[in-house]
Swiss-Prot record:
SUPFAM superfamilies: Zn-binding ribosomal proteins (SSF57829)
Designated name of the protein: Large ribosomal subunit protein eL43
GO MF entries: large ribosomal subunit rRNA binding; structural constituent of ribosome; zinc ion binding
Keywords recorded for this protein, A-Z: Metal-binding, Ribonucleoprotein, Ribosomal protein, RNA-binding, Zinc, Zinc-finger
Cofactor note: Binds 1 zinc ion per subunit.
Organism annotation: Pyrobaculum neutrophilum (strain DSM 2338 / JCM 9278 / NBRC 100436 / V24Sta)
Cofactor requirement: Zn(2+)
A biological process term (GO) from this entry: translation
HAMAP family reported in the protein's UniProt record: Ribosomal_eL43
Zinc listed as a keyword: yes
Length: 101
């Protein structure tokens, strides 16, 4: 097995001894969250979403493109507002069911 310089520092190992440990720890924390698996807002599948541009994300499974955070698909503020949006969607579905009858 080849020797790995990134066993402890993770993705920040590509910087070697440069930039200081504090910055490299922050980079590691951001990149681990960014490249991890996230839930698609459309198909609800748990996949590695593709970051197309700064804040633009795409689901590889269903092809859904959406705006999210710069480094993560969903921001902290977006998570806080999500329950309210779900209530509105459920209310709309209920209204549609009533009109369909």
């Amino acid at each position: 097995m080849p020797f790995s310089h990134t066993k402890i520092v993770g993705p920040a190992g590509r910087y070697g001894a440069r930039y200081g440990m504090g910055i490299r720890r922050k980079i590691t924390a951001i990149e681990v969250k960014q490249r991890g698996k996230h839930r698609c807002p459309s198909c609800r599948s748990l996949v590695r979403l593709q970051r197309i541009a700064f804040g633009i994300w795409k689901c590889p499974k269903c092809g859904f493109t959406f705006a999210g955070g710069a480094w993560t698909p969903q921001t902290i503020m977006g998570k806080a507002l999500a329950p309210e949006e779900l209530k509105e969607v459920e209310a709309q579905k209920a209204r549609w069911r009533e009109t369909a009858r």
